[in-house]
């Protein structure tokens, strides 16, 4: 077994993602029924990036999300603490930096926008991570957090949780190089704050004008904020 626990020890989490790196992108596309592409595009559009903007994409993994952001004409750098994930994305021509979300290797006020997609949930202290994101963002800059969340329709929520806890791990066994990691995925999603609670946590970390948009019925929530 190579999976992290909900204690989210950084070394365990990084090791787990190193183990899934080889088939990470295809596994996510299969498990999300192709919706991952829509979620990445929605994140890019919500940031309203301009050519020349400097963007930090945290927990970028194989840099597939970073490549999407570059379609805006912005200059984007991918950061992740899993070296294996960054290596798996070597063919994507964007700058890549190994770094921990709670100790980013960048100076204050370096970026016009910071984004983290499906990674905040894996940070050992995600509120501290949000503060660190604020530190490296210029005054007036933007934050986008795209993360699994709580479906808004109760019957759909019940079906989704059934899929998450039972079906998803079974499908992962067929397509993933480390299916146990997807047991952690399901458990961490179930334990994650809902949309409103996360919005309050983002605000407590120093961000303002926090709002969110539900995607795919609330399976994913896209939180946007400014500094």
UniProtKB/Swiss-Prot annotation:
Tell me the route in metabolism or biology where this protein functions.
Answer: Quinol/quinone metabolism; menaquinone biosynthesis; menaquinol from 1,4-dihydroxy-2-naphthoate: step 2/2
Q: Which UniProt keywords apply?
A: Menaquinone biosynthesis, Methyltransferase, S-adenosyl-L-methionine, Transferase
The entry marks the following residues as binding S-adenosyl-L-methionine, namely 62, 80, 100-101, 117
Annotated coiled-coil positions are none
- Which reaction equations make up its catalytic activity? a 2-demethylmenaquinol + S-adenosyl-L-methionine = a menaquinol + S-adenosyl-L-homocysteine + H(+)
What superkingdom heads the lineage? Bacteria
Q: What is a GO molecular function of this protein?
A: demethylmenaquinone methyltransferase activity
E.C. designation(s): 2.1.1.163
Keyword DNA-binding found: no
Q: Which InterPro entries match?
A: SAM-dependent_MTases_sf, UbiE/COQ5_MeTrFase, UbiE/COQ5_MeTrFase_CS
Q: Which GO terms describe its biological process?
A: menaquinone biosynthetic process; methylation
Query: One Pfam family from the UniProt entry?
Result: Ubie_methyltran
| SUPFAM superfamilies, alphabetized | S-adenosyl-L-methionine-dependent methyltransferases
- Which PANTHER family would you find in this protein's record? 2-METHOXY-6-POLYPRENYL-1,4-BENZOQUINOL METHYLASE, MITOCHONDRIAL (PTHR43591:SF24), METHYLTRANSFERASE (PTHR43591)
Cited function: Methyltransferase required for the conversion of demethylmenaquinol (DMKH2) to menaquinol (MKH2).
| Similarity annotation | Belongs to the class I-like SAM-binding methyltransferase superfamily. MenG/UbiE family.
Name of the protein in question: Demethylmenaquinone methyltransferase
Per the UniProt record, the lineage of the source organism begins with: Bacteria, Bacillati, Actinomycetota, Actinomycetes, Mycobacteriales
């Amino acid at each position: 077994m190579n999976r992290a626990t909900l204690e989210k020890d950084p070394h365990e989490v990084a090791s787990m993602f190193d183990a899934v790196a080889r088939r990470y992108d295809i596994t996510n596309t299969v498990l999300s029924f192709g919706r991952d592409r829509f979620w990445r595009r929605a994140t890019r559009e919500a940031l309203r990036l301009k050519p020349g903007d400097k963007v930090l994409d945290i927990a970028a993994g194989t840099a597939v999300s970073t490549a999407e952001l570059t379609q805006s004409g912005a200059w984007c750098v991918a950061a992740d603490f899993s070296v294996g994930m960054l290596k798996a994305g070597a063919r994507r021509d964007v700058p890549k930096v190994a770094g921990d979300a709670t100790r980013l290797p960048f100076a204050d006020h370096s970026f016009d926008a910071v984004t983290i997609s499906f990674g905040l949930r894996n940070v050992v202290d995600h509120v501290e991570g949000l503060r660190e994101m604020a530190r490296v963002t210029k005054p007036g800059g933007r934050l986008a957090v795209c993360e699994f969340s709580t479906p808004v329709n109760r019957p759909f929520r019940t079906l989704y949780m059934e899929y998450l806890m039972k079906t998803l791990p079974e499908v992962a066994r067929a397509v993933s190089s480390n299916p146990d990691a997807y047991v952690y995925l399901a458990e961490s999603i179930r334990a994650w704050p809902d949309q409103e609670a996360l919005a309050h946590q983002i605000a407590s970390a120093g961000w303002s004008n926090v709002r969110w948009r539900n995607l795919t019925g609330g399976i994913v929530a896209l939180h946007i904020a400014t500094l």
